[in-house]
Regions:
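TRNA-recognition modules of translation machinery and tRNA-sensing kinases, especially anticodon-binding
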Residues: 1-205
Length: 205
């Protein structure tokens, strides 16, 4: 550490820690939480054309989804979270693909992780906009986050999961880059009610 300052890298950190030292009731699972926050990264040693602009930011906004579930249901929860993130990208009409990370690329804290990448028309390459992970009992063990079985009152570690939904700067850039028309930038249909217009052009006030 270079100093004693701490900024969150993702909302997963404070949201998951809400349940530190908790013994949850089985009937209350799964617990689902969503948080929007600023995220901070040192990105030490990042420089050059491949990490400029939106590729590597020290601060950006992101929506995070978090789940706490029983071990036997955690992979069903993972599938539901994957469907949720994929649904967002479909509604935004963005070209995307999903990667299942191998053991060499996955964080040591996660048991299974999927990355979502959108196509950057300007850079002509795929950029990550979401990671969805099942940590199984790794985080719960450190948090002492447990649940009590309804039948025999046995206490067991929960499983924790989290995902980005989504990293906003790259999503905004992808919307702009992939919706270029001779008339201007087309706004995805799902966003029109929020924007109040269908096209972004030089005629707008």
């Amino acid at each position: 550490n270079l100093d004693d300052l701490y900024l969150i890298p993702t909302a997963e950190v404070p949201v998951t820690n809400i349940f530190r030292d908790e013994i949850l009731n089985e009937q209350d699972l799964p617990i689902k939480r969503c948080a929007y926050s600023a995220c901070f990264r040192r990105e030490a040693g990042s420089y050059g054309k491949d990490v400029r602009g939106l590729n590597r930011l020290h601060q950006f906004d992101k929506v995070e989804i978090v789940r706490i579930d029983k071990p036997e249901h955690s992979y069903q929860s993972l599938d539901e979270m994957l469907d949720h993130v994929e649904g967002l990208l479909k509604k935004l009409e963005l070209p995307y693909h999903i990667l299942r990370l191998c053991g060499g690329d996955i964080s040591f804290t996660a048991a299974l992780c999927y990355d979502f990448e959108v196509w950057s028309a300007a850079q002509e390459r795929w950029l990550e906009v979401s990671s969805v992970s099942n940590f199984e009992s790794y985080q719960a063990n450190r948090l002492h986050c447990r649940y009590r079985h309804a039948d025999d009152k046995k206490i067991e570690l929960c499983h924790t999961l989290n995902g980005s939904a989504l990293a906003l700067p790259r999503i905004v850039a992808a919307i702009i880059e992939n919706n270029q028309t001779p008339e201007g930038i087309r706004v995805p249909k799902v966003l029109v009610p929020y924007c109040g217009f269908e096209m972004l052009d030089d005629k707008m006030d």
